[in-house]
Amino acid sequence: MAIVKVTDSNFDDNIQSGVNLVDFWATWCGPCKMIAPVLEELAGDYDGKANILKLDVDENPSTAAKFEVMSIPTLIVFKDGEPVDKVVGFQPKENLAEVIEKHL
């Protein structure tokens, strides 16, 4: 499955069921650009098992504030609508895969 871009208005609907890794990012953020291809790979690897979502913090400040996102990229794993894990900064694919795996 492809990465899904979410907004303040549809965020809650998109995280309600299953395992969802949300990338809180911005267009001007260098590490956010570096992690994008890693997330694309994970979206393919976990197709049908977990969803990869992206939320632009500049366009959607309410959701970023709700989850206290202070630095980007911040990646939060939601399971059935609840935040269960959080990592901040660029992460190699293996690290993110481990984070996803422990919540499947």
From Swiss-Prot:
SUPFAM superfamilies reported in the protein's UniProt record: Thioredoxin-like
Chain ranges of the Thioredoxin domain: 2-104
MF-aspect GO terms: protein-disulfide reductase activity
Biological role: Component of the thioredoxin-thioredoxin reductase system. Participates in various redox reactions through the reversible oxidation of its active center dithiol to a disulfide and catalyzes dithiol-disulfide exchange reactions.
Protein name (Swiss-Prot/TrEMBL): Thioredoxin
Alphabetical list of InterPro entries matching this protein: Thioredoxin (IPR005746), Thioredoxin-like_sf (IPR036249), Thioredoxin_CS (IPR017937), Thioredoxin_domain (IPR013766)
Family: Belongs to the thioredoxin family.
Keyword list, A-Z: Disulfide bond, Electron transport, Redox-active center, Transport
Gene3D superfamilies xref list: Glutaredoxin (3.40.30.10)
Listed GO CC annotations: cytosol
Cytoplasm among keywords: no
Cysteine pairings via disulfide bonds: 29-32
Gene Ontology BP, a term: cell redox homeostasis
Pfam families: Thioredoxin
